[in-house]
Amino acid sequence: DISQWPVHKNSAAIVASIGNDKPLRYNTDMSYVFVPPGQKKIDVALVEYPDESDKGPYPVPENVPIEGWPAWFTRDADQKLTLEDVQRDKANQGGDRHAIVVDPFAGKLYEFYQLKRTDQASGGRKAPETRWQCACAAIFDLNSNKLRPDGWTSTDAAGLPIYPAVIRYDEFKAGR
């Protein structure tokens, strides 16, 4: 609980510049995963925006969290969904299904829109080597401010990464 922590000395000016009367929505359940050096890279089928996706392979680990995991998917005790159930969209909830993978050793950020674990490639072809699919995949160089090509989408639909906007507890604690 951070509600009793002191606010930034310029908090009032920051809030005023954004607009004190405007609604603020934030995701409390945007999970991400850091991968170790040498994380195996795999193919992910690009099923909706292949021409605006960065080509793989990608370092997607078996435990990659899907947006909402675990908070959203474990709130209902009757549901009893596992991470793999969520990855496969067993409950047919659909949605944005963002997934964020950070490779700090290679300085790369991988973001996926509608990531889904599957045993089939698009079009119903059996493809055991294709275990994941997504609508869009974006790779960002963490050592650069380079943007995606003009007009390209990304996992946030604006060509920008999501991860820089994720607020982490350790950042709050450090006062950043």
Question: Locations of the language-model features?
Answer:
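Short, surface-exposed polybasic-aromatic patches that bind anionic ligands, especially phosphate groups
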Residues: 1-176
